Amino acid sequence: LGDVYKRQIHAHDWLTYPAGVHAKMVSGKPLCIHVHATDFDRSRGKVNPTVYATEKNGMDYADCIMCVSELTRQTVIREYHQDPRKCFAMHNAVYPLSQELLDIPRPEHKKEKVVTFLGRITMQKGPEYFVEAAALVLKRTRNIRFIMAGSGDMLDAMINLAAERGIADRFHFPGFQRGRQVYEAYKNSDVFVMPSVSEPFGIAPLEAMQCGTPSIISKQSGCGEILDKVIKTDYWDIYAMADAIYSICTNPSLFEYLQVEGKKEVDGITWEKVGLRIRALYENVLKNYGK
């Protein structure tokens, strides 16, 4: 980036906005803020007034607002009353997998298919829709196991829901996964599902696709703006989600298409390309600052 980054301030998400605003006032340098999520995403619309005020103040002072998706950009414009001309969609990307992760084997000749949810088990992520879709799938076949990996304030409720639906024997809750465990989970899966209610971006499907695992994502996910080789359903449409899961698990041709083409697609989504776009935006901010 040369010295471009030295001539402006870049603050990431609401906890850093007050420091960014203060640095701008003291230094006179332009402020770029990066919105990875808003409180509308985290709370399903039940916004904390203090958090909202901090977010909006940072946006009001910002000379440039980078959002991780067009979905988030529209939230910033609509809910925080920001000028569209200073708001930009800046999608996330993935780094190439290390050789160590590439060498993790995919199990062959499994007797049962594995469908995985991996992430925070909170209301933003829509875990209950995954459980309900699983219950529908298991009415059609018992040859599939479902995994909900992660932790969060809805974990106990999801364990109880699986029991209420009579699918506890087909459902597993291995807890929080870290590092290599995450990629082992992806590679052990036949389908990855991200049923988020409001997902500013969502990096997990890209990681799963890197591992050759077909993905199903909600239409309310920002990553869907740059992914085509996935199946997209509304988060609340458990019937469409169940159909997609069942189809991938029972149709080898569909599985292979999403596996091969999905990996090709995600391999072209790199941080180097994103970095060039950010640099160009930095330069544009500097050129126009103070005009």
Model-derived regions: residue spans:
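Conserved donor-binding/catalytic core segment of Leloir-type glycosyltransferases
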Residues: E108-A134, Q259
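Aromatic "clamp/platform" in nucleotide-sugar-dependent glycosyltransferases that forms part
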Residues: V197
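Nucleotide-activated donor-binding/catalytic signature segment of Leloir-type glycosyltransferases, i.e.
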Residues: I159-Q177
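Conserved acidic donor-binding segment of nucleotide-sugar-dependent glycosyltransferases
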Residues: V230-Y239, S247-P252
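Short alpha-helical donor nucleotide-sugar binding micro-motif in glycosyltransferases
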Residues: F176-Q177, E184-S189
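Short hydrophobic beta-strand element within catalytic cores of glycosyltransferases
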Residues: P214-I217
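Carbohydrate-associated surface elements
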Residues: L71, A93
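Short, small-residue-biased leader/transition segments that mark boundaries at the very start
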Residues: L1-Y5
